[in-house]
């Protein structure tokens, strides 16, 4: 099993109540060697109920303290998950350059100023229309924002569709997805394999293995592994499935990040 989880949330994220210490202790108990905290920093998130923002100076003080405290047991990296929207390029450029992050995930949590987590997004459209809109917005976002290392959970939108994965496949959206993958590869960006899809009952990881295979075929090499856990019990969720999936898709390595630089590790 891969021993590095590079997508993890704590109480610094508005959708988690777990103290960072609890995540570290569970990761050690599970035998992980490396973890990277990637709490949510979503500028201009729609609505006022859940502002996905945290004080970054406080975050770094806490994470550096934990890194020193547990340095003999686990390697703790300090990252962030930024929420991509096309008008936020300058804001994220300034933000990311202001702190010594090890790793930056760029994720699309908002499509056309709406959060697909809520059913209203799907009310006036079919799942296929909604998914295509999300992929097109993703392409717009990554063209507008340069300050991230990997694109998070590419087909995240499928978690919340009315029929979820019933009518979803890579081939149905291959034109849009291929443009996303080609752009990322051309600009030195990677993708992540996010196991939360299994947790949500989709039966596949994010992105779907068909997309992982296509990314590899197109020459993509940078691929991090993360469970997107918000609770200790979700750390390294279903990680025993990851190496076989990656091998089947043509990969020999996975990727970790340190000081914003990719480090390639052979699959176990």
Predicted regions and their residues:
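A structural motif
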Residues: 32, 37, 101, 147-148, ...
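Conserved residues at the C-terminal ends of beta-strands
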Residues: 38, 107, 154, 194, ...
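Extended substrate/RNA-proximal surfaces in nucleic-acid metabolism proteins
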Residues: 49, 54-187
